[in-house]
Amino acid sequence: MTATFTWDLPMDSTAAAIARQHVRDAASTTNDVIDAELVASELVTNAWAHGRGTGAITMTITVTDDVMRLEVCSDSDGIPNQVASRDEAPEGRGLLLIEKLAINWGHDRRDSTLCVWADVQCP
């Protein structure tokens, strides 16, 4: 069975917390959503931090029997790229976390919109 949920999130610092709550709600039938919450939080935080600051952030969650796909779309000129982060730096680890926690991830450009997605295994 597949279920899909889509929400518009505010383009501000509250978006990541709202996204984590939506992951918990969408995954109410799975046992372990911690990885999915963290991936969603990083995707949304990156959209907010690196986007143009216009419009909303759109998050879509698609849940199948064993995988949760998290897709976050926002207005952005860039593409995701990992940067070297200093140990004491508070940022720069988002894509590294996504890469470690997701079984697959990528991005798509849709006109002026960047969509970044990640598939997280749900036991």
Model-inferred region functions:
Residues 1-6, 48-123:
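Conserved beta-strand-loop-beta-strand hairpin that lines the nucleotide-binding pocket
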Residues 6-18:
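STAS-typified acidic loop motif
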Residues 17-41:
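Conserved short strand/loop->alpha-helix "switch" segment adjacent to the catalytic nucleotide/phosphoryl-transfer site
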